[in-house]
């Protein structure tokens, strides 16, 4: 298991950030601390009640097993932090946080892995498999794959220098998955701010949650095909959009024209690509957001612009809002047709 041209390497929402690999997705209100008290309940779909301390007695080794695998994997491949974070995003945004994104296709089930936003883009499945195997060996049929995704996402942020939060657990794993739901439900890297706000609100997430979760794009990479629209002023000879950094766009165009749009890849954050920090927002204010949907946060809406400015100047505010938004997103419930899988790739 176990300088401007140096942007050229891969990419998630997703992200995504987010790795927030090839087609990142753009992603609270205060949450309780880790007291062991009953946690979130979402009024969306099947009612889900989560608990901060569910596994303290039934599987006390669970969190340490997850952290050990994430730490080792990210040390070997820093991009994996974004990949694991993005897996959790893409899971929760499609019919809730139910590990449906992990199901392999079968003769009777065409799931989310082959949906356009995920195909040849999501990664990290083997890491989740390894974590699940180790946990099953000590606590069989106790810890859900959906909870593993939530803990692995948190630990990916932590080992990358970001904040830690208590993860509520008690999710169940879906026995179904939907390619169409993934195709229709995941935001595009070309989404406008109004579309993003609507998408997040439909899941019970606020505008602040959306801007905070988009900060996951401080990690990961993206293919040229994900940000072609950012290069349009250079390609068409039209005036640059408000907030565009022409030097930045020219460097991207050089990359994509040299190696080809389907091959060219670059960091979502060129300054601190493997560190979870607030540099993503600083980049947006200087016109160096990679994805159209990222740069839009700083130029299309005064409300999101104000949040971007706050996060760019105060990392502690970003960290606090990100933690709260992750807990809130992690409480989006799945359906009632669920179980605790023995193998995350297939139903029992």
Curated annotation (Swiss-Prot):
Task: Tell me the first and last residues of the signal peptide.
Answer: 1-21
Q: Which GO terms describe its biological process?
A: hydrogen peroxide catabolic process; response to oxidative stress
Record Pfam families = peroxidase
Q: What molecular functions are annotated in GO for this chain?
A: heme binding; lactoperoxidase activity; metal ion binding
Q: Where is this region: Disordered?
A: 170-189
> Which residues hold Ca(2+) 1?
91, 94, 96, 98, 100
Q: Quote the cellular component terms of the Gene Ontology held in the record.
A: extracellular region
| Primary enzyme class | oxidoreductase
Keyword Metal-binding appears in the UniProt entry = yes
Q: Where is the active site?
A: 90
- Which keywords describe this protein according to UniProt? Calcium, Disulfide bond, Glycoprotein, Heme, Hydrogen peroxide, Iron, Metal-binding, Oxidoreductase, Peroxidase, Secreted, Signal
**Binding-site positions, substrate:** 187
Belongs to which family? Belongs to the peroxidase family. Classical plant (class III) peroxidase subfamily.
Question: Main role?
Answer: Removal of H(2)O(2), oxidation of toxic reductants, biosynthesis and degradation of lignin, suberization, auxin catabolism, response to environmental stresses such as wounding, pathogen attack and oxidative stress. These functions might be dependent on each isozyme/isoform in each plant tissue.
Protein name as catalogued: Peroxidase 40
Which source organism does the UniProt entry give? Answer: Arabidopsis thaliana (Mouse-ear cress)
Primary gene name? PER40
């Amino acid at each position: 298991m176990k300088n401007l041209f140096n942007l050229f390497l891969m990419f998630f929402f997703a992200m995504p950030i987010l790795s927030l690999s090839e087609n990142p997705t753009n992603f609270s209100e205060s949450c309780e601390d880790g007291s062991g008290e009953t946690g979130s309940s979402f009024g969306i779909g099947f009612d889900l009640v989560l608990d901060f301390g569910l596994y303290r007695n039934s599987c006390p080794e669970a969190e340490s097993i997850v952290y050990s695998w994430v730490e080792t994997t990210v040390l070997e491949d820093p991009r994996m932090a974004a990949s694991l974070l993005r897996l959790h995003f893409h899971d929760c945004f499609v019919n809730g946080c139910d590990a449906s994104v992990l199901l392999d296709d079968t003769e009777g089930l065409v799931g989310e892995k082959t949906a356009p936003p995920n195909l040849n883009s999501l990664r990290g499945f083997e890491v989740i498999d390894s974590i699940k195997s180790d946990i099953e060996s000590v606590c069989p049929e106790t810890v859900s794959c959906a909870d593993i995704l939530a803990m692995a996402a948190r630990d990916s942020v932590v080992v990358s220098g970001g904040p830690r939060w208590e993860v509520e657990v008690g999710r169940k794993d879906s026995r179904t998955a939907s390619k169409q739901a993934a195709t229709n439900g995941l935001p595009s890297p070309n989404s406008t701010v109004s579309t993003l706000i609507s998408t997040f609100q439909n899941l019970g997430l606020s505008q602040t949650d959306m801007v905070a979760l988009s900060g996951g794009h401080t990690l990961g990479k993206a293919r040229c095909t994900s940000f072609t629209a950012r290069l349009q002023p250079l390609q068409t000879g039209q005036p640059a959009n408000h907030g565009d950094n022409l030097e930045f766009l020219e460097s991207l165009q050089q990359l994509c024209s040299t190696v080809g749009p389907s091959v060219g890849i670059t960091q979502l954050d060129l300054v601190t690509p493997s560190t979870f920090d607030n540099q993503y927002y600083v980049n947006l204010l200087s016109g160096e957001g990679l994805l159209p949907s990222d740069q839009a946060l700083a130029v299309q809406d005064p409300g999101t612009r104000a949040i971007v400015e706050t996060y760019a100047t105060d990392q502690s505010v970003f960290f606090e809002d990100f933690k709260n938004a992750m807990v809130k997103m992690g409480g989006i419930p799945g359906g009632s047709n669920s179980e605790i899988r023995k193998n995350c790739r297939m139903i029992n």
